[in-house]
Amino acid sequence: MTHLTRVSAINWNRIDDDKDLEVWNRLTSNFWLPEKVPLSNDIPAWQTLSAAEQQLTIRVFTGLTLLDTIQNTVGAPALMADALTPHEEAVLSNISFMEAVHARSYSSIFSTLCHSKEVDAAFAWSESCDPLQRKAQLMLDYYQADEPLKKKIASVFLESFLFYSGFWLPMYFSSRGKLTNTADLIRLIIRDEAVHGYYIGYKYQKGLEIVSPGKREELKKFALDLLMDLYDNELAYSRELYGESGWFDDVSAFLCYNANKALMNLGYEALFPAEMAAVNPAILAALSPNADENHDFFSGSGSSYVIGKMEETADDDWDF
């Protein structure tokens, strides 16, 4: 373990990379907590789902919880160790915290909609689900390795690709008017993950600028090989989750769509052709910031999530 002997105070008035402040401001302005989303409004819709749909939903959210836990406790801290500026380190600490909020959010969904025994069964399932455990181990292996740029590649794939086999389901239900408040919460998570993937991809591209052309080619090959390994595993995971639902093909297209986005965050061209990444328009509409009238996606306001604003009052404000 490395023991610090000296820490310098961070000075936000002397910034080496303006992107650090830009992303810090975006993340802090996007701040939210699950307690502000009225998940209990989804109880009637939850009760209309079949037992199989309920089990699928709980398993999907359990898998997402595992990925958020990895990113919170291992992934973002591993990237912090490679930060080039204190401001980058601060942004990554914010990312780490919000991943903990995301993990907490799924527990809020569980405690609101589900019976404890059903949730316990899903967590037990997650420990024995081979594709889920394999992708978790792949992430841990790269986060615990010594190559900073490879860590960033793995992190972008987690943020911009691996989450989306799970995100598909609440968007599907939302497109059919079910679990709409849960979908509001998931959109908040997706909004965060989009910024995380963009920022870490940006830092990766900055890192490429200072390595040799040969190293750049090596890293590109590594990224493509890792993506295909993760993609094959994600197909297996999605088949285990969605195989009996009839939704597997739609989920597969969503995977290709987001794999291409992950590559673009790294500065690479899309890999999967348009016909493989043709997402159901209803899912894309559900992903839209304006998909649900209950929620203002960018401002964090709306009927489902409201932060009060303070305003000074005068004596005559109280004359009724």
Placement of each model-derived feature along the sequence:
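Non-heme di-metal
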Residues: M1-F320
